[in-house]
Structures are given as structure tokens and as C-alpha cells.
């Protein structure tokens, strides 16, 4: 039944579904109405656009070919880095390593931390320390995904435009980060702040909703949905953000 399913389209729809659930929670609670919902709304619209463009693409590859490449990428490695599909014009890189990459050649400032429903470990969010001073919109998130053996996943989003980029352009960190030049500064700013806005919304909604019930009961988890409906495939390689 799902032999011709398009990975990219499904991933985009699942991502939009998750954002829609968060948006519903925010709108249902007047106490969090002061939080800007524009980034979530834009993300939901982009998810539908990406799904439609993927389904209608004349160059779409057969499912079994792309699936074989995805499965090959799941072989455990000591340390691996992978380019992840993103929004048009945006490239995201992910790195799995036995130790957290605290020194990747750049200076980061932590701006958020949250508990992930399907994980025992919290996810930490960072942005470039020069985000305000030099309008550098590079961000990253770090999360331990298993403890035996330990594996830390670092996801990089955006390219450093600060002065530090020229000093460290040969470091491991700069190799992990890339933005297509077609992305304008205004788009970069919007994409870089979506993660931060989502964290603020979820934290505030959790604070209110947990007074009576758990907000997670109202959020559909992509990985659980994917595992139940499409057990032959993994959602990890389809992560958009």
C-alpha cells in the first residue's frame, strides 16, 4: 500500500502536523497569546508547500532506490556527519559522536532546553554568541540519544557570518555548517528563530497545561507515528529541523 510513498512529502506533512498541534495549544490558552505564532504558521505553510512540490516533482526518484540509500546511512559508525534535507535553499548538517562537541571552532550561547517525549535525555539549543552584535544566525542543538555506548547528536543550522567565521574556516565546525547563497538574510533570520520561538511556546504551554493535564497527550510524536504506520522506514533521515 505504501510502496510508492514519498519520504520527503510524508516528513514535511508530519513536521507540519506537529507544529499545528503546538499552535492549537497556544491558541487555546489566552495566557500565552502574547507569544508570536507567526513562525509556527509559516512553518506549517512551508511544510504543505514542500510536500506538494515533492509529490509533483518530475524528477522524483523511485521509492525503493531512495530507501536503499537511507537504510545504508543507518549503519552505526564511530562518528558520522550527514547532510539532512531542509527547506528550499537551506542545508542542515547532523553529527553523531561519542562525546559532545563542545569545541567546534565557534562560540555558542545556550538559549533553551527542553524534554523530548520519546527520549530520556533533554535537548539543548544554542545560537552564535555574535547573533545580536554581528547578525549571525547560525544555530545548533545538542542531545544525548543513547548511553551505552554514549552517542551525542549535534544538529547544525545555518552559516556563520560573524568575524569568527574567517578565523575558524578550516575547523571541523565550519565543515559541518552550510547555507546556499540563494538564501537572503531576512529568510535566514526567520529560519534561525523558528526553533527558539517553538521552545518558548512549548515551555509556556507546558507550564499552563501541566496544572491540569500533560500537554504531551495533545502532541502527536512524529517518530511514534512513523514507527506505527510505516515500520519499514525510519523518520530520523527525514528530519527537517
Swiss-Prot record:
Domain of life: Eukaryota
Signal peptide (UniProt feature, chain positions): none
Localization of this protein: Nucleus
Primary role: Transcription factor. Interacts specifically with the W box (5'-(T)TGAC[CT]-3'), a frequently occurring elicitor-responsive cis-acting element.
A Pfam family hit: WRKY
Name of encoding gene: WRKY63
Keyword Lyase: no
Homology family: Belongs to the WRKY group III family.
Transmembrane segments annotated in the record for this chain: none
Gene3D superfamilies assigned: WRKY domain (2.20.25.80)
Disulfide topology: none
UniProt xrefs under PANTHER family: WRKY TRANSCRIPTION FACTOR 21-RELATED
Residue ranges of the annotated DNA-binding region, renumbered to this chain: 97-165
Gene Ontology molecular-function annotations: DNA-binding transcription factor activity; transcription cis-regulatory region binding
Protein name (record): Probable WRKY transcription factor 63
Biological process (GO), any one: abscisic acid-activated signaling pathway
Region ranges (Disordered): 56-79
Keywords: DNA-binding, Nucleus, Transcription, Transcription regulation
UniProt source species: Arabidopsis thaliana
GO cellular component, one term: nucleus
